[in-house]
Amino acid sequence: MSRIGKLPIKIADSVKVDIKDNFITVEGKRGKLSQEINSSIRVKIEDNNIIVERAFNDKQTRAFHGLYRSLIFNMVKGVSDGFSKSLTINGIGYRVEQQGNSLFFNLGYSTQFEYVIPEGINIRLDGNTKIAVEGIDKCRVGQVAAEIRSLKVPEPYKGKGIKYDNEVIRRKVGKSGVKK
């Protein structure tokens, strides 16, 4: 039995779960998420809990067991609480501006980068160097944060670039000049 897969998922009072065939829909105060489920996995609701079980015991199904339990848990948490990732821009003259549905980055290049915010994702700016990516789908929030970070990955010498708030940049020592 999968250690993660066997844990029940508690359904909050504000969350509504609907299971039809191999499709689960979770609806809450923040929105609605749907997920198709592999035919080797069974999902049922018992006593205000979601139970994920497997139909077979082969290696692939055991892997799916924990995966789908985690996906459903993230759906329930997302529609009730939501997810967020914070990023910080480090560097002289590096900044971000929001205009409508786009972010414009000045990252030390001669041109600005434009990033169009995808639907279902909210972005808050705190000043011009802090970015908060928020949404109900954990996967999409992480993907958008990774795309923004990839515009200017932090470099190891001065730490200039876009980094996650909890990320530690391993610094390197620069060249040491030889004295004669």
Swiss-Prot record:
GO MF annotation: an example: rRNA binding
Top-level taxon in the UniProt lineage: Bacteria
Keywords, comma-separated and alphabetical: Ribonucleoprotein, Ribosomal protein, RNA-binding, rRNA-binding
Pfam families, sorted: Ribosomal_L6 (PF00347)
Keyword Calcium: no
Disulfides per UniProt: none
Family label: Belongs to the universal ribosomal protein uL6 family.
Subunit structure of this chain's protein: Part of the 50S ribosomal subunit.
Name of this protein: Large ribosomal subunit protein uL6
Organism: Borrelia duttonii (strain Ly)
